[in-house]
């Protein structure tokens, strides 16, 4: 009698065959993700396809949590899985254990992971950035010895700020040996006592620029004591070196612009400073001239004796007061002596007279000494003031042969204020002279 199998029995048998085949327990598959879904449980359901075929796939939550990227529709992936049968539907499918992006996608995945790691460790913090010197004396340029990058940097620096010294350090920027060469050249440039380092190269694919994403290159830039400008690739290219550098330039040309001031802008600033300073000096000189003219016209400087007449009079008054005080004291003493003579016996009179004479003599000596000291001090003070005033006096200056030149009742302080045939007046120590200017000679001509 013929025996028929149930659908379930056949499906279980086929599943048993799949599960027992060692070649199906670990297969490596390359394909594109499609119909991707993430279940609320954390499991992933999707298809893996190529141009000719499609296979169903699922990935349990435990394995999905270990992925280094977020899978999405259209990703090209490399998968490690086992092949089995889903009994309920009778479909064969793959159960994915590991999955990673294929090719360039894998590089982007690696880049993103390293970027997150370095950012978390503080390598990209703004507080670690160093300022780029405004007026550098030396700039080290690290790039390939040939190519557009080095030409653009050198020509831009020469046009903007030719005073700076450029130190070209030929550096490998692509290939297996470039990573170590970049590290060594940055360390070498840091030892040269330059003001700024430019690290750059032209554009390229992510593979071409990858050396500037290497972790040890990033850390070398971070540890550099000299400010670094990163100019790797074109404006749309970003590397980890850009994030860790003190400044990121979109292109090598922009790096040269950031590193140097514009000589033409500096010249304009210098001219503006020169104009401002010149105007200030002229204003200051004019103010001082006005002050001098004002002081020179003061009436006491025209008659210096007016400055010390009061002091002389005050000294004479003090002298009269001292003499009067002395005479008054002497008269009082004489009167007192007379009273004593009348009050005491004649026998004691000589003794009393002698004592009074001594007292009067001592008093007279003290008063004379006080008066002499006061008069001497006053004479010294007066003499010093007279000497100071005479030194400032225009009259004293004229006694040495100088004359004051006046034109239209104003003091002439410069030959630039005179012209031929001008009528002038020369004031001397004993009078004045009217004269006519025949010729003007200036020292600066």
From Swiss-Prot:
Key words of the record: Cytoplasm, Exonuclease, Hydrolase, Nuclease
Sample GO molecular function, one term: nucleic acid binding
EC top class, as a word: hydrolase
CDD domains listed in its UniProt record: ExoVII_LU_OBF (cd04489)
GO biological process, one term: DNA catabolic process
Cellular-component GO terms for this entry: cytoplasm; exodeoxyribonuclease VII complex
KW Transmembrane helix (keyword) present: no
E.C. numbers: 3.1.11.6
Main location: cytoplasm
Localization: Cytoplasm
Catalytic reaction equation(s): Exonucleolytic cleavage in either 5'- to 3'- or 3'- to 5'-direction to yield nucleoside 5'-phosphates
Reported function: Bidirectionally degrades single-stranded DNA into large acid-insoluble oligonucleotides, which are then degraded further into small acid-soluble oligonucleotides.
Subunit: Heterooligomer composed of large and small subunits.
Family named by the database record: Belongs to the XseA family.
Record's protein name: Exodeoxyribonuclease 7 large subunit
Lineage: Bacteria, Bacillati, Bacillota, Bacilli, Bacillales
């Amino acid at each position: 009698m013929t025996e028929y199998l149930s659908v379930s029995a056949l499906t279980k048998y086929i599943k048993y065959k799949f599960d027992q085949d060692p070649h199906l327990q670990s297969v490596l598959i390359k394909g594109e993700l499609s119909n991707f879904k993430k279940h609320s449980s954390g499991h992933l359901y999707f298809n893996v396809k190529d141009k000719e075929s499609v296979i169903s796939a699922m990935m349990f939550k435990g394995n999905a949590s270990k992925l280094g990227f977020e899978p999405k529709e259209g990703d090209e992936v490399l998968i490690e899985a086992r092949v089995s049968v889903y009994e309920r539907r009778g479909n064969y499918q793959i159960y994915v254990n590991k999955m990673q992006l294929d090719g360039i996608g894998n590089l982007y995945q690696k880049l993103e992971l390293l970027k997150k790691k370095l950012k978390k460790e503080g390598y990209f913090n703004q507080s670690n950035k160093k300022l780029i010197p405004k007026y550098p004396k030396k700039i080290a340029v690290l790039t390939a010895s040939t190519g557009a990058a080095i030409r653009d940097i050198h020509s831009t620096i020469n046009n903007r700020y030719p005073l700076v010294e450029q130190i070209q350090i030929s550096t490998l920027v692509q290939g297996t040996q470039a990573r170590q060469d970049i590290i060594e050249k940055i360390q070498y440039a840091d030892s040269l006592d330059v003001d700024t380092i430019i690290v750059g190269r032209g554009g390229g694919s992510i593979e071409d620029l990858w050396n500037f994403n290497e972790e040890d290159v990033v850390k070398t830039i971070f540890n550099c004591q000299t400010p670094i400008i990163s100019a790797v690739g074109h404006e749309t290219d970003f590397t980890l070196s850009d994030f860790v550098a003190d400044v990121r330039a979109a292109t090598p040309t922009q790096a040269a612009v950031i590193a140097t001031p514009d000589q033409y802008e500096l010249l304009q600033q210098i001219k503006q400073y020169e104009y401002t300073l010149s105007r200030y000096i002229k204003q200051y000189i004019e103010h001082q001239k006005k002050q001098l003219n004002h002081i020179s016209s003061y009436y006491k400087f025209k008659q210096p004796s007016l400055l010390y007449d009061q002091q002389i009079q005050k000294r004479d008054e003090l002298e009269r007061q001292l003499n009067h005080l002395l005479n008054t004291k002497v008269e009082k003493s004489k009167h007192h002596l007379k009273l004593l003579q009348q009050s005491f016996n004649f026998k004691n009179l000589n003794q009393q007279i002698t004592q009074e004479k001594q007292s009067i003599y001592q008093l007279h000596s003290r008063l004379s000494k006080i008066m002499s000291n006061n008069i001497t001090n006053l004479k010294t003070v007066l003499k010093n003031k007279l000497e100071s005033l005479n030194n400032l006096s225009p009259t004293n200056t004229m006694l040495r042969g100088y004359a004051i030149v006046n034109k239209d009742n104003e003091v002439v302080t410069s030959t630039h204020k005179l012209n031929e045939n001008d009528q002038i007046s020369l004031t001397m120590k004993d009078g004045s002279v009217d004269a006519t200017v025949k010729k003007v000679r200036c020292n600066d001509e």
